[in-house]
């Protein structure tokens, strides 16, 4: 499979946006001082836009798997074991840290409680992605088989998934529709990525992608208080994620060692950045609001990003832990 450097750029960009979103949220939700209500509104609205880079990760998975000639269960099980290992090492560490922040003590019971949180999925919010990816990899060989069909079949399957996992659940708020498809919209995002890999999208469509993105953002602003934008399966937000990927994918990117290095570190940065955020806001109780709030958040974001990339770069040099990141 020929490497597409634009996908590496998309992966890095999405990772940085996730870090930025988390830095912005803690500024208002973990502030040691009262927060201006108007500032909170602005932060939450911007984070709602940023949130829609998360489905792009699933689209990338589908895009890359469709480019592979084969996808065996032995390959997928190795990845599943890796993610399970991440949960019971990195996830367990995060659970222990959180319990120490809450209980201000560390003992044998702390470890037992932390283990329970890993099993029950009660970790820091960003770890939901790890649990979801495990589920995706368990069915990835089946998805790969579908993505080897003709273009018409792939488009049909992807369209049906959009209707039954994205559109109908949304419309059900107003019109009860009895037909159900027992899968979440994550499966649609994976199939959409695979469909894009099989279809030659035209570069002169980037203006159309940009227009759709702009319309989605305008809609989100006007209907901010009506719809549940935190749900990553909202139809308008879904269109936003799809067009973000299509637009970014068309960017011409020159091969670069720095780009490949940062892309290889992105997964680890996604995993580890909340550790630095939580230590800063819960341990050192830093204040990101008040005067020059936006500048403080920007500096905080840059600091967390540099710490995360630097830490993961070092950790990947250690044989015993590099497979986790």
Language-model features: where?
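Alpha-helical transmembrane segments and terminal signal-anchor/GPI-anchor hydrophobic tails
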Residues: 183-187, 198-260, 268, 275-283, ...
């Amino acid at each position: 499979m020929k490497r597409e450097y634009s996908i590496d750029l998309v992966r890095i960009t999405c990772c940085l946006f996730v870090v930025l979103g988390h830095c912005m949220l803690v500024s208002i939700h973990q502030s040691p001082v009262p927060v201006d209500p108007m500032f909170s509104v602005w932060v939450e609205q911007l984070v709602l836009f940023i949130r829609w880079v998360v489905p792009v990760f699933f689209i990338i998975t589908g895009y890359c798997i469709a480019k592979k000639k084969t996808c065996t269960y032995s390959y997928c099980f190795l990845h599943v074991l890796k993610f399970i290992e991440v949960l019971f090492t990195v996830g367990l560490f995060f659970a222990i840290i959180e319990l120490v922040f809450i209980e201000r003590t560390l003992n044998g019971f702390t470890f037992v409680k932390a283990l329970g949180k890993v099993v029950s999925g009660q970790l820091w919010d960003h770890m939901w992605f790890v649990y979801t990816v495990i589920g995706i990899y368990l069915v990835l060989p089946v998805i790969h088989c579908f993505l080897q069909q003709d273009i018409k079949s792939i488009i049909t399957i992807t369209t049906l998934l959009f209707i039954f996992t994205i559109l109908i659940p949304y419309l059900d708020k107003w019109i009860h529709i009895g037909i159900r498809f027992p899968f979440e919209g994550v499966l649609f995002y994976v199939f959409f990525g695979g469909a894009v890999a099989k279809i030659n999208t035209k570069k002169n469509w980037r203006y159309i992608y940009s227009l759709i993105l702009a319309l989605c953002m305008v809609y989100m602003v006007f209907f901010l208080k009506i719809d549940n934008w935190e749900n990553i399966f909202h139809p308008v937000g879904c269109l936003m994620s799809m067009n973000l990927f299509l637009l970014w994918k068309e960017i011409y990117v020159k091969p670069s060692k720095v780009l490949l290095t940062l892309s290889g570190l992105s997964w680890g940065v996604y995993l580890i950045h909340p550790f630095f955020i939580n230590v800063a806001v819960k341990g050192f109780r830093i204040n990101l609001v008040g005067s020059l709030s936006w500048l403080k958040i920007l500096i905080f974001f840059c600091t967390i990003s540099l710490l995360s990339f630097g830490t993961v770069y070092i950790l990947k040099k250690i044989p015993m832990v590099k497979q986790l990141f």
